[in-house]
C-alpha cells in the first residue's frame, strides 16, 4: 500500500525528451520526493492525459486511492488539454481549430474530480503547470509539417503557445481557490530562474531532470512552510 497517489500527464509521469526519444526518467520528481520526504508514491500519471482521460484513470483506481495512507491526492492536468492537432492546422490554417479540451470542459471535469475525491474523504492537491518555451515548442511541433502554415494560424505570434498554455494554468489556480483546496505553485519556481528554458527538454514543454529537481524542491518547500503532515 502506497502513502500517496498522484495523477496527471507526462510531466507528472516524469517523461523527458532526450536524443529525440521520450522516456521516463529515474530522476523524476516523484522519485526525488520519495527520498526527501520519506513517503511512497503511487505514480499513476500517463503520457498524453487530458483531464477527461485522467478522470477515467482516477475512477479505475478509486479503490487504490481509498487505500492510500495519506488523505492527499495529487493532480496535475492542463498541458495536453490546451494542445492542438498541429497536423490538421498545418494542412488547413484557415479552418477553425479547437484545443483538445475547451476551457469549459477543463474546468467542469476538474471540478467534478475534486468533488468526487472529497466525497471519499480525500483532499485533492493541485500542481500548477511548469511554463513552456514557445520557440523550442514551435520548432518541435512544426517538425516535418508546414511551419509557415502553423505560424499563419498563430497570426505570426509564436508566443501564443506560451499564452494559451498559461490560460489553462490560470484556471488551475482558480480551481484551487474556488474549491478551497491546496495548490503547489510549480510555475513560480521556474520563473524565478532567469533562463528557465534550461530546465526544459528540447521539445520545450517537458521539464528535464534539472526541472524535476525544481519541482521536488517546490513540493518540499510547500510542505515544510505549512508544516503539513503527509501521513496521519
Regions found by a protein language model. Name each.
Residues 16, 55, 195:
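A short local structural element in Rossmann-fold oxidoreductases
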Residues 49-59:
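Structural motif
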Residues 1-47, 62-67, 73:
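Serine-esterase "nucleophile elbow" of acetyl-processing enzymes
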Residues 59-209, 213-232:
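Alpha-helical cap/lid subdomain in secreted, periplasmic
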Residues 10, 16, 47-50, 80-81, ...:
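Gly/Ser/Thr-rich beta-alpha loop segments that engage phosphate groups in nucleotides
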Amino acid at each position: 500500500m502506497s502513502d500517496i497517489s498522484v495523477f496527471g500527464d507526462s510531466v507528472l509521469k516524469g517523461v523527458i525528451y532526450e536524443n529525440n526519444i521520450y522516456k521516463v526518467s529515474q530522476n523524476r520528481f516523484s522519485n526525488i520526493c520519495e527520498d526527501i520526504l520519506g513517503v511512497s508514491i503511487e505514480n499513476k500519471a500517463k503520457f498524453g492525459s487530458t483531464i477527461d482521460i485522467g478522470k477515467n484513470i482516477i475512477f479505475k483506481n478509486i479503490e487504490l486511492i481509498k487505500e492510500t495512507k495519506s488523505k492527499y491526492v495529487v493532480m496535475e492536468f492542463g498541458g495536453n488539454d490546451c494542445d492542438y492537432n498541429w497536423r490538421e492546422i498545418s494542412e488547413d490554417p484557415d479552418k477553425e481549430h479547437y484545443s483538445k479540451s475547451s476551457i469549459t470542459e477543463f474546468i467542469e471535469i476538474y471540478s467534478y474530480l475534486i468533488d468526487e475525491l472529497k466525497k471519499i474523504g480525500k483532499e485533492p492537491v493541485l500542481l500548477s503547470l511548469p511554463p513552456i518555451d514557445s520557440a523550442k515548442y514551435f520548432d518541435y511541433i512544426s517538425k516535418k509539417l508546414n511551419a509557415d502554415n502553423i505560424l499563419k494560424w498563430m497570426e505570426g505570434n509564436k508566443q501564443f503557445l506560451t499564452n494559451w498554455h498559461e490560460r489553462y494554468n490560470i484556471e488551475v489556480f482558480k480551481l484551487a481557490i474556488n474549491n478551497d483546496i491546496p495548490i503547489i505553485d510549480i510555475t513560480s519556481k521556474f520563473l524565478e530562474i532567469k533562463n528557465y528554458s534550461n530546465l526544459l527538454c528540447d521539445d520545450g514543454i517537458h521539464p528535464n531532470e534539472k526541472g524535476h529537481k525544481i519541482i521536488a524542491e517546490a513540493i518540499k518547500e510547500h510542505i515544510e512552510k505549512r508544516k503539513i503532515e503527509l501521513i496521519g
